[in-house]
């Protein structure tokens, strides 16, 4: 099992549930190091003073907040540590709300909460209660040196998930956007758009959306490591420009129908094979019984 990154307690009223926190997401981004193209040596980043033009030791570096162009207010580590929240080692639940009330823009990182064996019943009780009520919990927790706003919610397999959240004043309102004025869609355009949405609707299956760029980059790295010659791929031709919104919707609907037919064809074939197999297994006994009746 992965290593816990935090341990403490999940508090629910007067109920105290000892838990450990595990990362729920592991990014698989392809990471590169910076190298000198002449000799392949690693590039080092150093703390360099722009005035004295020399490297500065870490102990002589302070944090500065720019209050006006070129003017900074410096703050020491000790001054900042005085404002660090007290590490209470608790995820304290304050409220229960509908998940649909929370804009996805609020969510940051995701984790799993795992209880101690002694608290398994209380952990399940909280999860079952939230599932039955259709609610999620809003909580606060001190993770590292920051007090985080959190959402605790039921997850698959009876687990509880915790997502850290942005604060309200960190979310930009869509009202601040300068959206261009749009004309009223025609009833035909709206009908075709609704048909397109319906034709592309289905269950969320995240495995259908792999990171193709990452796969291609890893393949490129593997081929270069094996000494294979690499040719730059030819640019894909641009698609024909569609001028009319109605034409674009119509073409999209046609493409969606073709895709649906391609997916349906194997399914129809599988159903035909299954029906034929069933007929073979069930038809023979019937035929045998019929022939026996005739002989009798």
UniProtKB/Swiss-Prot annotation:
Bias (Basic residues): 286-296
Keywords from the named record: DNA damage, DNA recombination, DNA repair, DNA-binding
Annotated coiled-coil segments of the chain: none
Keyword DNA damage: yes
A Gene Ontology BP annotation from the UniProt entry: double-strand break repair via nonhomologous end joining
DNA damage listed as a keyword: yes
Superkingdom of the source species: Bacteria
Disordered: annotated span: 254-296
Record domain Ku: where: 11-187
Record-linked Pfam families: Ku
GO molecular function terms noted in the UniProt entry: double-stranded DNA binding
Ranges of Basic and acidic residues composition bias in the record: 258-273
Primary role: With LigD forms a non-homologous end joining (NHEJ) DNA repair enzyme, which repairs dsDNA breaks with reduced fidelity. Binds linear dsDNA with 5'- and 3'- overhangs but not closed circular dsDNA nor ssDNA. Recruits and stimulates the ligase activity of LigD.
PANTHER family the record matches: NON-HOMOLOGOUS END JOINING PROTEIN KU
Subunit structure of this chain's protein: Homodimer. Interacts with LigD.
Protein name as catalogued: Non-homologous end joining protein Ku
Species of the source: Anaeromyxobacter sp. (strain K)
